[in-house]
Amino acid sequence: MKLYRQLLVTQHLSKLRFSCARYSTSTCRYEFQIKNTRNIGIIAHIDAGKTTTTERMLYYSGLTRRIGDVDEGSTVTDFLPAERSRGITIQSAAVTFRWPPLNQATTSHDGHNACVSYTINLIDTPGHADFTFEVLRSLRILDGAVCILDGVAGVEAQTEKVWGQAQKFKIPRIVFVNKLDRVGAAFGRTVRQIGSRLRGYPAVCQIPWFEKETGKFRGIGDAVNLRALWWKGESDGKNIQSFDMKELLQEDPNFHGELIKARIALVESICDFDEQLFEEWLAVNDDSLSINAQSIWASIRRCLIDGSGRLVPVFAGASFRNIGIQPLLDAVNDLLPDPTERPDPEVSIENQKCGLSEILQGRLVPNFTKNIKSATMKTLSNSLVSKIEACALVFKVASDIRRGVLVYVRVYHGRRVLQMQASDAVEISCLDKGQIGVITGLKYARTGDTLIAYPNFNPKIGPPSPLNVVQLRPIDIPPPVFFAAIEPHSIGEEKNVAETLGLLIREDPSLNLSIDEDSGQMLLSGMGDLHLEIARDRLINEYKAKATMGNIEISYRESILHATPENHIVFDREIAGKKAKAACGAIIEPIVQLATDILQKTDNFTTIHNGNLITVKFLNSTSPEELNQKLPPDLSSSLVQSSLTNGVISALSRGPRRSYPLHNTHVTIIINVESDLFSKETTPAALASVARLAVQDALKESHSNGHIIILEPLMKVLISCDDTSLGAIVHDISAARGGHVVSLGTGINEEDAIELPPIDIKKIYVPKDNFTITDINDDTNNTGQRRQVIAMVPLKEMIGYLKHVHSLTAGRGTFIMNFHRFERLKGHRERVL
């Protein structure tokens, strides 16, 4: 099915002429356009102000005529009814705008960035932990990101999570400390937390400016350009008064002195990372004030662009009060990379990885050995890859009432056709390499698909191998841990409900639909209770499906304790009125090491599916050429492999003990081409059936021997509380919930961790906060400071935990949790189940 979908997508793209060769554009103009493109995302913890900041960006760019409000439900990027009613972002939204607006930009002859209007493709992402996968699939296609921090709460748990994910993709990031107008906002404390929790050295480019008498947040001090910006009154943020250093000395002498300290600290901190600026600093006798702003911006960019996260530019503002947005947009233009400055996107071809440029240039992945499946890569040639007209990654699929299915793509090679303004599609003449846009009319495309335009191919078999299995930047979909039954109101509604659920799953692959074989019920699985609640709301209210969702339950798994002996069977019966015959053997064993390690060592056809390894082993065959010669005329090695794999997947979807899906098993299908295949009687359906029956028989035999176990989801829980509540939280986790505490402290998430050395936060420059209860030198040693508990807890014990943690912490505690692994259910917990 997957291959079929890819073929249809490719066929449609070829009809669209998705190719840069179809348009006459000078190379110079094209390079100028791509150099002035920024693909960025807004990432943060929930309620940090992502959507509010995005709305201001759209307003100041001239794309909208009024500022949308989250509380009113009038935002552009939160356009789903569920988003507007709940006031949270559920889906990533794509929007394109120019900054500065075209009417404010002028032609530049010296290349100064401020005179050029840039195209910014912006993705506003969710902050809730249930929608982490939505963030992940957006991160794949970004060239840079703006991380927004709540100036009151500081670095929060989900912030660390998404920061770690961006670190894995090596995405350059800048930080915007938001909500500095709020009571309790502490810019200095938040900056220190960037160093202690995110492990990046904060380069403080802006500092907050407060009124002397009232302490009200009025603007920012720009340490790079040595100026102060004052946003006057309760305006729309366009009335800005700028003060140079001489004027600032008259207006606010104390802030003038602080801004000088900030400039000196900024230059000295950057010199530790950039040798070029260090030499320039030495040339002016260590005078940080005499270095021009262009040199500082260029130096920060050099440190930032590799995505290492070692230096973190920090900016200040208050989005709701319209303060600080325009300088933030300038920083996006000046600091974040264009598409040509990012590393070559990773491509997977049958579990082997290489760069896209290697494919387009006909070069091979260096580590090909005797692996049968990777040997097909040797057929790559310049004549083969030179025909690739376009290549794009589907990172999102959405349904539109007027235009049907919209397929969001990031173009990596070639050009084509629409751009999105959140919920509105705007047709454009073409979509260049490096751009983000939308294609309509792709009936079978799903999130994660790779789109290739290839001329003159056979629509039945698609482009030549191995181009028909190329995958751009593949990511693993985390296993769903909650499920609920979907019950249509009548038999006549079943088809419509199933089709509607299919649309939801195309949009969000972290949802999963299965059918209970005993009851026939449709079971919808997801990443969390909120995730499924949103799916239910969309199913009933948006798509008007006549169905009811049952109670949300936990999704358990089954696994095997010991390896089974080879179970060899022969399938010989009619399928659709035609004789079908095939044979194979099956061995099932538990996975005792990482599946990826096994994948790298095996010399057979091996795939990973839902936490299981599936291997197809052909006896007495050493190469694809030899194998294909032995197969019946209507079969190929890839078709045999996919048919057998589909049969195994079907068998593993339902265990013998409690009908839960199998997990953490390694299934090996053994097939002798000479004795297990029977000419024309061996069809793909026969191969799938014999593999399914062989695995099911082996599982039943294992169950009769008491070797099938139950697994439950184990969650990694991050609880934020104050010192006074810490003891109660730890006791509750350990005693009442059957969990175990992994660590206490400031809570650096080791699994997503930033692979950088710890930073001495006492060396970090921060201005004095507008109010301070104590002199904060770190986040862990003061009574009343926020602490974080990292624990492993069974998912069942975390149901309804939010109310409980509020009770234990007097309403001040928060938590997030993410799936960690499936763990064996034992003793009392197994008996209760």
Q: What is each stretch, according to the model?
A:
Residues 124-125, 151-158, 512-514:
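A conserved hydrophobic secondary-structure block that centers on an alpha-helix together
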Residues 28-148, 204:
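P-loop NTPase switch module centered on the Walker A-proximal segment
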Residues 47, 53, 87, 124, ...:
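Conserved structural-core and active-site-/substrate-pathway-adjacent residues in large, well-folded domains
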Residues 34-37, 51, 73-74, 87-92, ...:
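Amphipathic alpha-helical transducer elements in NTP-driven molecular machines
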Residues 193, 202-208, 213, 334, ...:
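Accessory interaction regions appended to the cores of large information-processing enzymes
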Residues 119, 143-147, 170-176, 308-313, ...:
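Short, surface-exposed connector motifs at secondary-structure boundaries
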Residues 114-120, 139-146, 270-281, 476-488:
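Gly-rich Lys/Arg/Thr-decorated short loops/hinges at beta-loop-alpha junctions or inter-strand turns
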Residues 2-7, 26-46, 151-395, 399-400:
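P-loop NTPase catalytic nucleotide-binding module
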